[in-house]
């Protein structure tokens, strides 16, 4: 190791971040549990968008498993073995959730785009069987990229404070970590382009048909588009701006101590935004899933509003 590895206190002063991670965890676990209950209670019609949302919810539960461990480790009260477990397992779960979320949000955008721009046609990609198949492929692909980070042997280093996960990695582990980060950035860029193009096509179609009385509710469609796009930008874009420079500081390509500390703090701040998708996803379920929306109405609305919502849902299903 270089001297900067010994004397640069990169991994300190994390306590302020932990309170925000804890808040995200509390809101997220409540929202995810309610979403699970709603999807189980309501017999969904297994449209493509519902399949993608259920996969998104499953990925969110991985994040709820990982966040408590990260919080304890960042508070500095975790035993040494838990720190090692976090570096090998739970940190990877956070990134598995992140890239599954990015990919499934892209498929949700594609599905919405095809529904609104080609409402009279059903493409192969819109069939539930295809959605299940592609969801399986996505899970396998992301796990294939991430799981080796859990399995590659690590160094047996002496217990100490101010230690980062990279210090546990041997040379092959460091190289795989670097490769993984570049692959994940490529995934982010490609699926971001898909989301942007899909949403632009939808907006163009809505604009062309704004005077058509038979066209679906334009305002509702635009809200859905803006919801997905805004949530995506807030959660994932800042993190990926920081990701590559921070990775270079981890591998000591960037050696200046103050720069490394700044990049680490920026990474933690933007990672907080990224995991906050756990809080935004239940809002997404509400706007995109009839089953979830109906269950929310039944649970929290007055009997009169519940009856009106059921009648509206029945009309939508018969349409």
Swiss-Prot record:
Molecular function in Gene Ontology: G protein-coupled peptide receptor activity; G protein-coupled purinergic nucleotide receptor activity; G protein-coupled receptor activity; neuropeptide binding; neuropeptide receptor activity
Pfam families, sorted: 7tm_1
Nucleotide-binding is among the record's keywords: no
Protein name according to UniProt: G-protein coupled receptor 171
Gene Ontology BP terms: adenylate cyclase-modulating G protein-coupled receptor signaling pathway; G protein-coupled receptor signaling pathway; negative regulation of myeloid cell differentiation; regulation of feeding behavior; regulation of sensory perception of pain
Keywords linked to the UniProt accession: Cell membrane, G-protein coupled receptor, Glycoprotein, Membrane, Receptor, Transducer, Transmembrane, Transmembrane helix
Tissue: Expressed in both T-cell subsets and natural killer cells, while it is undetectable in B cells or CD14(+) monocytes. Expressed in peripheral blood mononuclear cells (PBMC) and Jurkat cells (at protein level).
Organism: Homo sapiens (Human)
One Gene Ontology cellular component annotation held by this UniProt entry: membrane
Segments traversing the membrane: 22-42, 49-69, 90-110, 133-153, 182-202, 225-245, 269-289
